[in-house]
């Protein structure tokens, strides 16, 4: 669901974008054992939508937080990257229904 959150703020996984996603499993202990039968507990698939939505929203918010936290800085060979003007970012988020007025 991470790519969906990226897509909500305009990302489209362009060639060379370098997107990397890491996921952690909460699988039942011993579930991957190759010996004997195992009993597992799981949430029914139809009840996972809330978790999926929360993941998309968390990724979207994390990206916006990074945009707001960015500061103007100078790098190698005098290359300067500029912080985004917060008022303009807010305007864009409102315009594209990503934020309420």
Region locations from a protein language model:
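A structural signal for small-residue-enriched, beta-sheet-centric alpha/beta enzyme cores
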Residues: 1-101
């Amino acid at each position: 669901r991470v790519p969906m959150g990226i897509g909500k703020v305009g990302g489209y996984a362009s060639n060379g974008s370098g997107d990397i996603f890491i996921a952690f499993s909460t699988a039942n202990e011993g579930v991957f054992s190759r010996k004997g039968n195992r009993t597992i507990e799981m949430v029914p698939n139809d009840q996972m939508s809330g978790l999926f939505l929360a993941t998309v929203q968390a990724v979207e918010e994390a990206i916006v937080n990074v945009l707001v936290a960015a500061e103007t800085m100078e790098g190698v060979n005098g290359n300067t990257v500029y912080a985004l003007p917060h008022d303009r970012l807010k305007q864009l988020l409102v315009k594209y229904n990503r934020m309420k007025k």
